[in-house]
Amino acid sequence: MNNSYYVGLMSGTSMDGVDAVLVNFDGDQPSLIATHTEALPKALLSNLQKLCLPGNDEINRLGHLDRAMGKLFAKATNALLEKAGVDKSQVIAIGSHGQTVRHMPNLEMGFTLQIADPNTIAAETGIDVIADFRRKDIALGGQGAPLVPAFHQHVFANPNHQRIILNIGGIANVTYLPGNTQDVTGFDTGPGNGLSDAWIQHQLGQPFDKDGAWAASGTTDQKMLQHLLSHPYFALAAPKSTGRELFNQAWAEQQLSEFGHLSEADIQSTLLDLTCYSIANDALTLSDNGEMYVCGGGAYNCELMHRLRKLLPDYKVVTTSELGMDPQWVEGIAFAWLAMRHHNGLPGNLPAVTGASREAILGSFHPAD
């Protein structure tokens, strides 16, 4: 009986569902066995979005949502194993990222907070859970993010190719994998899908801009784009990370107040270009040319991919499918990998990426028994 399975659970800043993956790490490369996405109920999504911003009665709401998300993550796991026909006894551990509700690493006492109670997940699945991956890195002086570059290095690095792995969720991050060297770098570039998702949700009641069609129907306002790109975050040197605390709907609306003459579609186009230009500007500081492999929800946005290719004519811009990994599941597999690293007593962070003082075993262990 194969007993080498790990489950990875991920809900990103876009909050578009809980991604669950079943992975085997016996070979040189991870083998994806099964996948499942558990939708977030509307009421739960609304409460999570509110919790991501300062408000009243936060501790009570936090405690309730921590348990509720734990139950949802457990439900996703059980559905995944049923779909795969795999018994829980065959799973070594679950690697749960949780749901980020605060990420503020640059305070004097920096912190990050993810919810989805791992004790609840362990109790309702009967499987050991490894969670809370980010806070050890912060305790060591790091940003606690991005964590996926260590995984990207493990599975995508090639000594003969200069590669950027671009993950576009609510926030976008890059991993730079230079050929013939171990000098991997990575950081959050800024907004990914988050701002354009929020705008279309607010204006049209749609969860996201499918294929970037609404953005494509508008015209980018260059004055507004330059205003958005003047945000101090874009000028920061790595290591750096960001989140909804900085780039959120309230921030966008504050910026838009100076540009009331624009159509809704023009604003959507401009928000998409903010994502594309901030990514392209950072890519060009890393290298004039190379290969860019895109994963996350943004990989399915045709207009976004088209604009990136125009901004980076000397880059080959494709999705991670060309490297044999479905763009939707890369992050989930990464957290299954981090669970495997923890289980085997191996470090999971890259200090050159996060700014931590040293490598460390990431995550806390929550036994099923």
Curated annotation (Swiss-Prot):
Keywords: ATP-binding, Carbohydrate metabolism, Kinase, Nucleotide-binding, Transferase. Coiled coil: none annotated. It catalyses: 1,6-anhydro-N-acetyl-beta-muramate + ATP + H2O = N-acetyl-D-muramate 6-phosphate + ADP + H(+). Pfam families: AnmK. Pathway: Amino-sugar metabolism; 1,6-anhydro-N-acetylmuramate degradation; Cell wall biogenesis; peptidoglycan recycling. GO terms for biological process: 1,6-anhydro-N-acetyl-beta-muramic acid catabolic process; amino sugar metabolic process; peptidoglycan turnover. CDD domains: ASKHA_NBD_ANMK. It is an enzyme of class 2 (transferase). The keyword Transferase applies. The keyword Transferase applies. Its EC number is 2.7.1.170. ATP binds at G12, T13, S14, M15, D16, G17, V18, D19. It comes from the Bacteria. NCBIfam families: PRK09585.1-3, PRK09585.3-2. Belongs to the anhydro-N-acetylmuramic acid kinase family. Catalyzes the specific phosphorylation of 1,6-anhydro-N-acetylmuramic acid (anhMurNAc) with the simultaneous cleavage of the 1,6-anhydro ring, generating MurNAc-6-P. Is required for the utilization of anhMurNAc either imported from the medium or derived from its own cell wall murein, and thus plays a role in cell wall recycling. This is Anhydro-N-acetylmuramic acid kinase. It comes from Shewanella halifaxensis (strain HAW-EB4). The lineage of its organism: Bacteria, Pseudomonadati, Pseudomonadota, Gammaproteobacteria, Alteromonadales. The gene is anmK.
